Amino acid sequence: MTPQLPPVEEKFHLNSVRISGAVQRLWASGTDVLLRLSVHDGERVTLLLPNSSLDGRPLTLMKGDPISVAGYLIEMPYLETGRQFLEHLGREDLLADVPGLAQVVDKRMATCVVVQSLQIGEAIPTNEVVVEGIVARTWEKGEQRFARLAIYDRHTETDGEGRRGRPRRKAHYVSLHFPDGQVNGRKVTLKARDHLRVLGRLSERRYSESLGYFLMRAGGIGLLAEAPNSDSLRELRTQRVATYVVVESLLMFTK
């Protein structure tokens, strides 16, 4: 009979954010509240306030309020329809040219900060992130280098029993940006499964996405086949933003 190994204590990756700025707007998402924060360095960040409260205490927040927040990063799923894609462009009139487009649905992800503590009032300008995790993939755009980091922190959801008595967990994912492929003037070379701990700041990168790419993601690219001016429709573009951790220092752990 094979002896059973004793359970192993769980070890969690680091995942923390400290940030301050002014509330730009607020909106409801079910029982939760989402906030757009205008940060001192010109960045904008999305915050998630679970159940519209902190530790069960209701809050009073308004546009323009200066706040300081501590929390952690997650990727929040949301759905976008073809109708919403065209509404962003002010081109709902095109729905008649592409039957079925309004019903197409694409599952997307948005990076946000889950708020654990919040102070209202002027504060020292702050935008600090510490995250640790396993590199899932890397890519490059010109001289810029990026990585997707899988973070197994104490806030991750469990999904059944894993090995040696530990629960199986679903990672949080965040994107890292290494400006010019460097950290502190040193070139960075990464590969999948590298274990990193980074210090950085939150930043948004703007990009455009075509209707053709949206439909390809959503499995509805065939809808354009019979549409008039399908080529021009395919190239209709909407503006997107993606949130990254801009890496300012790096620890690359060895096994």
Predicted regions and their residues:
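OB-fold and OB-like single-stranded nucleic-acid-recognition modules
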Residues: 1-255
